[in-house]
Amino acid sequence: MATTAAAAAAALSAAATAKTGRKNHQRHHVLPARGRVGAAAVRCSAVSPVTPPSPAPPATPLRPWGPAEPRKGADILVEALERCGVSDVFAYPGGASMEIHQALTRSPVITNHLFRHEQGEAFAASGYARASGRVGVCVATSGPGATNLVSALADALLDSVPMVAITGQVPRRMIGTDAFQETPIVEVTRSITKHNYLVLDVEDIPRVIQEAFFLASSGRPGPVLVDIPKDIQQQMAVPVWDTSMNLPGYIARLPKPPATELLEQVLRLVGESRRPILYVGGGCSASGDELRWFVELTGIPVTTTLMGLGNFPSDDPLSLRMLGMHGTVYANYAVDKADLLLAFGVRFDDRVTGKIEAFASRAKIVHIDIDPAEIGKNKQPHVSICADVKLALQGLNALLQQSTTKTSSDFSAWHNELDQQKREFPLGYKTFGEEIPPQYAIQVLDELTKGEAIIATGVGQHQMWAAQYYTYKRPRQWLSSAGLGAMGFGLPAAAGASVANPGVTVVDIDGDGSFLMNIQELALIRIENLPVKVMVLNNQHLGMVVQWEDRFYKANRAHTYLGNPECESEIYPDFVTIAKGFNIPAVRVTKKSEVRAAIKKMLETPGPYLLDIIVPHQEHVLPMIPSGGAFKDMILDGDGRTVY
């Protein structure tokens, strides 16, 4: 991962031309597209990147030292980030991280995006990583700044998101003295990170950063935290860039390419099956092309988890869309009736399986995953392969193409059976006059963007409707807190995705409860003029909890109304007025007939925009398999207007 000094110097020199002269290193314009990992940029609206004026050359060099001259530890840290390919960080300053921010102002490469809360910046780093495949980097000060990262780190661990979080710490001599803003963040985050470091020697910084990025992005991706005391940041040293990583045990345990014999065994099971199903998760986010080719060669229908949305196109005839608690009837039917379950890049999460004993009870199970800890953890497979799913699919496809026999079994009867389920049990909802069904609003958004926008969500009913009613066509198009279920994720994640995909329309489909948790990040999308559209499905309630109250608690309301109890007829808080306070255009709609024109205007307006859509709180997300239930327990109708 380390580059030669000459190559690094050349890269930094080229990048410096683009960055030199930016004040405070914050972008105040829509950025021109640059190379990235992932799908090609798609513009869903009239928004076009604005090319900034050419900056004047600096009066003095940003870094007035030579390669062999000493510099502060904070500058070594920033140079190490540059050598790992970092161009964007999400950092909020404080006393213990000031040196890092000062060093960032001397970087010719890295831009800082100043979110207004550390949780917001960390969710933005997650959105950046999810939407690009690159490592997201966030920086916070010690104490409360560091602890504000906790939810985002836990979220990244559960959803396998590559992140590096860097925290300032009190000076080494003060550690353990309960100094001002001292928190043992390494201990706090030990169980919610893939690995973490406390740097006690300035000379370790190049190696530690190199290792942190390797750990975050290799194997099963995840978050890594690096805690750096302030005196280490201030200490002068000459960096040694050719230091090798010291991870012998970890590297030795990384999965190897799958054995041909195991892949042949999988294909034999495919050949023997009559009702196979592919169960695809977030572990396939880097192997969309290989997955589509495998499906083309075999004709096996595909269902995805919440994390797997987009890894196989939702509009493909062989797509069964999402399975699980709020998955389609036909996806859950297919898993229940299947004789072979190919589980690729999944972890048999409880929201997918329900009653684990009843899940795929008729099927032989093949589980391929890069994390050995997931194999057999929840459901025992008949065949297991611990490997990168991308390599496994490449191997399977090669074997299928080499075969002299017919590569595609005749699953036509199975296809017809599932097509009948699709016709009999489509996703649907009821309409009540001019009330706006939230599902309808998402369908209109899908139609007007042609299913090409990047979608971020908060957590709740709106999240499930966005999963059900938007058409995801490619990996990294869907961004949501799946494992942790962290409200407040949507807006900052959308902003991070926009940074990673300049000029591309990103829509945060949010609920009023989730949106309010990180509403302050409207400031960032306005200041940087990011084309982030916020579409709030506002029912004045904590909708998913209300749904459970309706179904399982005799509709007894227990602190789930989020409006003003003294005047329930008003919309409270007034998101339109709040957005305008951030200088963001905003509109509220209350009638179904207004929705299409309002969404069209939102998409056509350059820069950020907020659309507040008032929806009924009685709507339920359906289908629904109750927690711990099985396919036979699926609920297909009813809402909050019904007495149970």
Curated annotation (Swiss-Prot):
Region Thiamine pyrophosphate binding: start-end pairs: 461-541
One cellular component term from this protein's GO annotations in UniProt: acetolactate synthase complex
Any single Pfam family the record assigns to this protein: TPP_enzyme_N
Consequence of changing residue 627 to I: In strain: cv. Japonica /Kinmaze; resistant to imidazolinone and sulfonylurea herbicides
Catalytic activity: 2 pyruvate + H(+) = (2S)-2-acetolactate + CO2
One BP annotation, GO: isoleucine biosynthetic process
Transit peptide: 1-43
Additional detail: Acetolactate synthase is the target enzyme for sulfonylurea and imidazolinone herbicides.
Name of the protein in question: Acetolactate synthase 1, chloroplastic
The organism of origin for this protein: Oryza sativa subsp. japonica (Rice)
Gene: ALS1
